[in-house]
């Protein structure tokens, strides 16, 4: 199993590390620590004297320093993760750092296409407490990466991921997606609760669709349990 752990080097992202280790400690695998730092700085044309070459200035001063700093922090984060793995006695897990310059969105998508990971692990907040899930990066990555993604809130304490709620709108991809969830979480033998919200409790069309989805799993072999339920709500 291969996991891409995408980080901005913030303290908030430390919550990702125990999950990455726990997913792999039984079967083994590789954790790719990924970080992309911006290699372009935009400055207003009237910010400096007209005879100053701002492109060269930022290339030789700020951007070079940014690269050095990113390399140093990546080394520290990699060593920290390796030490955590050793403490867990998980000798079957390897760590590979990937540090690149460029747009984080584009670089993560390209890395995903190249490495074909089983899972991308990300935080929901970055430096300065920015709400990552409200940004455009995550929306783009989710639509352009054909890879399962797991987002962990920064204030969430690690625990076994056993109880899973899967909200379905009866997509043709439901069976494949649920199979992937079982595969990723097989270490925990998860209990997956498949739910669909309906405004009318006696909606027969929705009931039939849920029954068909349930039938698809009757003869499947998987580690864990799966339950199906229609949930009545006035605000579906």
Predicted regions and their residues:
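Small/aliphatic-rich secondary-structure junction motif
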Residues: 1-60, 162-227
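Residues at secondary-structure transition points
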Residues: 11, 61, 65, 99, ...
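Gly/Ser-rich helix-loop-strand patches that form or flank binding pockets
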Residues: 26, 106-157
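Residue-level recognition of beta-strand->loop/alpha-helix junctions
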Residues: 35, 99-101, 153, 196, ...
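Structural beta-alpha unit
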Residues: 41, 68, 72, 76-120, ...
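A short acidic, glycine-rich active-site loop
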Residues: 55-72
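Short, flexible hinge/linker loops that cap or flank conserved catalytic cores
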Residues: 89, 158-159
């Amino acid at each position: 199993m291969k996991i891409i752990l995408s980080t901005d080097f913030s303290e908030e992202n430390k919550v990702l590390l125990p999950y990455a280790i726990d997913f792999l400690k039984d079967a083994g695998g590789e954790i790719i620590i990924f970080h992309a730092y911006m290699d372009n700085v935009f400055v207003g044309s009237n910010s400096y004297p007209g005879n100053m070459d701002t492109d060269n200035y930022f290339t030789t001063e700020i951007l070079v320093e940014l690269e050095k700093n990113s390399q140093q922090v990546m080394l520290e984060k990699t060593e920290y993760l390796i030490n955590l793995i050793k403490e867990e006695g998980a000798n079957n897990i390897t760590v590979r750092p990937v540090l690149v310059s460029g747009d984080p969105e584009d670089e993560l998508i390209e890395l995903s296409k190249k490495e074909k990971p089983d899972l991308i692990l990300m935080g929901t907040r970055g430096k300065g407490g920015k709400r990552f899930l409200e940004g455009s990066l995550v929306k783009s990555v989710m639509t352009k990466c054909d890879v399962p993604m797991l987002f962990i809130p920064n204030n969430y304490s690690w625990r076994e991921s056993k109880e899973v709620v899967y909200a379905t709108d009866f997509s043709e991809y439901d069976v494949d997606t649920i199979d992937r969830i079982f595969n990723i979480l097989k270490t925990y033998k998860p209990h997956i609760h498949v739910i669909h919200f309906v405004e009318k409790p006696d909606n027969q069309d929705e009931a039939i669709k849920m029954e068909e989805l349930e039938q698809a799993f009757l003869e499947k072999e998987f580690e864990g349990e799966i339950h199906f339920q229609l949930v009545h709500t006035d605000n579906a």
